[in-house]
Amino acid sequence: MSLEIPPEWKNFKYRGKSIDELLNMPMDEFIKLLPSRQRRSLKRGFTDAQRHLLEKVRKYRREGKFNKTIKTHVRNLVILPELIGLKMAVYNGKEFVEFTVTPEMIGHYLGEYSITTKKVEHGEPGLKATRSSLFLAMKG
């Protein structure tokens, strides 16, 4: 699981640990660094879908496929250090939203980076849509 760390990530620390320390750290030690919600989620274990995604990630790392995007519907996986540097595409209910996992994302969920709703932008009301439109000039 070798990862070439870009220069801008060299100084990054998560709870006082560098990226190299996080990558070499056993899972139970890493879990202790997480906030309570993520810690409890990981202590319960991985679901089948999460396990399958992590196996796929490990396979891509072994083969050195860092530029290939991994598509997934799994939104409830906590971002682990082994996901750093990979391109992920998480389904938001309509399409896959693509992003690259950075060290700042550790401890967050994948779904946080694939927003499921968008801001509603209402258009202009049509002719006779409201009582006030009675006084508008007829569209020609």
Swiss-Prot record:
Task: Return one Gene Ontology term, BP aspect.
Answer: ribosomal small subunit assembly
Q: Which sequence ranges are marked TM in the entry? A: none
Coiled-coil stretches, from where to where? none
Please indicate if the UniProt record lists RNA-binding as a keyword. yes
InterPro entries (UniProt xref): Ribosomal_uS19, Ribosomal_uS19_CS, Ribosomal_uS19_euk/arc, Ribosomal_uS19_SF
Respond yes or no to whether keyword rRNA-binding is given for this record: yes
Q: Which GO terms describe its molecular function?
A: rRNA binding; structural constituent of ribosome
Q: What keywords would UniProt list here?
A: Ribonucleoprotein, Ribosomal protein, RNA-binding, rRNA-binding
Q: Which SUPFAM superfamilies match?
A: Ribosomal protein S19
GO CC list: cytosolic small ribosomal subunit
Which PROSITE patterns does the annotation name?
Answer: RIBOSOMAL_S19
* Top-level taxon in the UniProt lineage: Archaea
Report any Pfam family annotated for this entry.
Ribosomal_S19
Report the sequence similarity comment from the record. Answer: Belongs to the universal ribosomal protein uS19 family.
* Stated role: Protein S19 forms a complex with S13 that binds strongly to the 16S ribosomal RNA.
- HAMAP family with a match to the protein in the record: Ribosomal_uS19
This chain belongs to which protein, by name?
Small ribosomal subunit protein uS19
Q: Which organism is it from?
A: Saccharolobus solfataricus (strain ATCC 35092 / DSM 1617 / JCM 11322 / P2)
